[in-house]
Amino acid sequence: MSQAVQEVVQTIDVQATPERVFALWTEPEGLVQWWPEAAVFEPRVGGEIRLEFPQGHVTGEVTRFEPPTAVGFTWIRSDFPGYPTRVDVSLTDLGDGRTRVELVHSGWDALPEDYVAQWKPVHNAGWEHFLRLLDDLIAGRPVDKTWGAVEE
């Protein structure tokens, strides 16, 4: 890619401890409450991750596992297996039972410009959507995992 591409960065503050948020990101039973339909997550660096969605699946490898403050993994879409990116999630204890969730989706600069032009905005909107669902789950609000933007 000829030009530098910014990372996708999304941040949200939630009313839960870092331990609870970390579990919702790393335990399959927690993940399926707000994000994929089914999940495999091996809780260790080098572990497998597989997320099943109505539109396809994502696979990857856990690259960072630091309970309860950070998790990272590679992100490989089933429809574009040759285009891996990386997702890193950092959790900051804000006190009073609140946690800041910062997600950074990187690796776009190594991908073809047409792929980035099409899929980076979708991922940006998708992460914003699903982080809101994480907050909805934590707050006890209904969680509607419907996500039409990736149904291409």
Task: Give the role of each language-model region.
Residues Q3, G107-E152:
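A conserved amphipathic terminal alpha-helix motif
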Residues P36-V40, E52-R98, S106-D109:
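Hydrophobic-ligand binding "helix-grip"
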